Every structure is written in structure tokens, then in C-alpha cells.
Amino acid sequence: MNQPAAQTVTGYFDSSALVKRYLVETGTLWVQTWCQNQNQTVAIAEIGLVEIAAAFAGKLRGAHITPVQYDSARADLAIDAQAEYVLVAVNRTVVDEAIELTSQHRLRGYDAVHLACALILNRALVARDLLPLVFVSADNDLLNAAAGEGLSTENPNSHI
């Protein structure tokens, strides 16, 4: 008897989580495993790519990575963003929801944007009878806000 195909699980990653795919940190193995799983998808706000690139540059300036590692990480991010990731555009609807979230939770500006993107994407998934997303971040305040909004959460730092 044929087994039904497994539904894809979407993980919405903020930059603090997805950067771990490219730089070795606590939680790197867990993030890399998620990204390699054929039944799991990675979603991120387009602005998250800028945040990740800035993290790479900061690591380079701090001499935590070499110029070769920096170039490789940037190139890999560009390839993955084009080929693998669901990129969530930041539009007026996202901005309005993010503004509202800042009044309800202890969030920095871009963290509110990430959460708004995830909530909007989650509503779209559920409306299509797809599995709700998992919100992935290494930021505890952001994870608490996401959980408060009803999202399932994962902290890659909890997976050593």
C-alpha cells in the first residue's frame, strides 16, 4: 500500500537563526540539518538577507572569519536565496502589522518585521490547508513574541 506523501513543513527563519547555516555557531548542525531535509522549507524576509550579509561583514571585521570564508558565505547565501528559500517581501501590509506588534511585544524594529512576515505567511499556509509554519530564531524575546502570537517555535541554540 502506498504511503501518503509527507507534507512540507515551512520554517520561517530570522537572520539570527539562518546565519548559522553559513557560520559555525551553537545550533549550526541543527540549522544545516533542517535546510537539507527535503520535507522542510526555509522562508525568510528579504531584509533578512541584508542582516545576514551584515553579520558576515561584522565577523570579517572582527577577524572571526577570513576573507575567503566571507566571500564563500556571501556566495552561498546568494545561491541559496535564489534556489532554495521562500523570500517574503516587505510591503505596507507587513509594515502595518509590524508596527502593531511593537505595541504588544518587546521587539526591535526588524524583529517585528520578521514576526509580521511569519504571521502573514502562516495565515496563507493555513488558509490553503497546509501545515502551520515553525518560527525559528536564536532571539528569546522574538521567540516569546512568536509563541504569544500562537506560532510554534524553535531555538537552534537549544540543539547543541
Model regions: which residues?
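Aromatic- and histidine-enriched alpha-helix N-cap/loop-to-helix transition segments
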Residues: 44-50, 110-113
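Active-site neighborhoods of divalent-metal-dependent phosphate/nucleic-acid chemistry enzymes
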Residues: 83-141
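Acidic, PIN/NYN-like endoribonuclease modules and their adjacent C-terminal/linker elements
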Residues: 1-10, 121-160
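Helix-adjacent hinge/juxtasegments
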Residues: 58-93
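Short glycine/serine- and small hydrophobic-enriched flexible loop segments
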Residues: 54-61, 119-123
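Amphipathic alpha-helical segments within well-ordered protein domains
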Residues: 16, 53, 57, 99-102
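Short, well-structured N-terminal submotif of metal-dependent ribonuclease cores
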Residues: 1-48, 59-72, 151, 157-160
